[in-house]
Swiss-Prot record:
Family per similarity comment: Belongs to the peroxiredoxin family. AhpC/Prx1 subfamily.
Role played: Thiol-specific peroxidase that catalyzes the reduction of hydrogen peroxide and organic hydroperoxides to water and alcohols, respectively. Plays a role in cell protection against oxidative stress by detoxifying peroxides. Together with AhpD, DlaT and Lpd, constitutes an NADH-dependent peroxidase active against hydrogen and alkyl peroxides as well as serving as a peroxynitrite reductase, thus protecting the bacterium against reactive nitrogen intermediates and oxidative stress generated by the host immune system. Does not however seem to play a role in detoxification of isoniazid.
Classification lineage: Bacteria, Bacillati, Actinomycetota, Actinomycetes, Mycobacteriales
EC number: 1.11.1.28
Extra information: The active site is a conserved redox-active cysteine residue, the peroxidatic cysteine (C(P)), which makes the nucleophilic attack on the peroxide substrate. The peroxide oxidizes the C(P)-SH to cysteine sulfenic acid (C(P)-SOH), which then reacts with another cysteine residue, the resolving cysteine (C(R)), to form a disulfide bridge. The disulfide is subsequently reduced by an appropriate electron donor to complete the catalytic cycle. In this typical 2-Cys peroxiredoxin, C(R) is provided by the other dimeric subunit to form an intersubunit disulfide.
Domain of life assignment: Bacteria
Sequence position, cross-link Isoglutamyl lysine isopeptide (Lys-Gln) (interchain with Q-Cter in protein Pup): K41
Annotated localization: Cytoplasm
This protein's GO CC annotations: cytosol
Keyword set, alphabetical order: Antioxidant, Cytoplasm, Disulfide bond, Isopeptide bond, Oxidoreductase, Peroxidase, Redox-active center, Stress response, Ubl conjugation
One function term, GO molecular function aspect: thioredoxin peroxidase activity
Protein name per UniProt: Alkyl hydroperoxide reductase C
Length: 195
């Protein structure tokens, strides 16, 4: 399937995830208490940051996942929900979170796309059968507004994802390297001044 692009509707999903938050504070009576269902309906009407990584227990991936975790409150302040997805199962996600110091208190769900249906529908399932390192910003109307895919060896810039979200939410024309609080471009003034 082709890579989703700007204006496409983000696919529906109903997947299992490791709950967000400090795993040591989960009131777990049984192993299943660490897991939850995550569906596309859960965040209807909200901005979503949905990012994919290739594999758990690797080297670049935890740096990115932890970076999204550190900025989660900033995304929440912008009424945006973060979801991280890979094709690993929920038990692998759980073990990785439990063992990796930077992931133990991850505030958002780690989603398992074991059947690879969402990964394929987004167009980021690669020839190795795992997800490409991809990021989607999806608006409250479920429309893709930003797509980024990097090589497996190159981690993404989470600050840039936040910057782009700010620009998209400004609903204005934003120049190169624009940051929240910077002036936006007034095309009307520019056109009037050119005549």
């Amino acid at each position: 399937m082709a890579l989703l692009t700007i204006g496409d509707q983000f696919p529906e999903y109903d997947l299992t995830a490791v709950v967000g938050g400090d795993l040591s504070k989960v009131d777990a009576k049984q192993p299943d208490d660490y897991f939850t269902r995550v569906t596309s309906k859960d965040y209807e009407g909200k901005w979503r940051i949905i990012f994919f990584w290739p594999k758990d227990f690797t080297f670049v991936c935890p740096t990115e996942i932890a970076a999204f975790g550190k900025l989660n409150e900033d995304f929440e302040d912008r009424d945006a929900k973060v979801l991280g997805v890979s094709v690993d199962n929920e038990f692998v996600h759980f073990q990785w979170r439990a063992q990796h110091e930077d992931l133990k208190t991850l505030p958002f769900p780690m989603v398992s796309d074991l059947k690879r249906e969402l990964t394929a529908a987004c167009g980021v399932l690669n020839a190795d059968g795992v997800a490409d390192r991809a990021t989607f910003i999806v608006d409250p109307n479920n429309e893709v507004q930003f797509v980024s895919v990097t090589a497996g060896s190159v981690g993404r810039n989470v600050d840039e994802v936040l910057r782009v979200l700010d620009a998209l939410q400004s609903d204005e024309l934003c120049a190169c390297n624009w940051k929240k609080g910077d002036p936006t471009i007034n095309a009307g003034e520019l056109l009037a001044g050119a005549v």
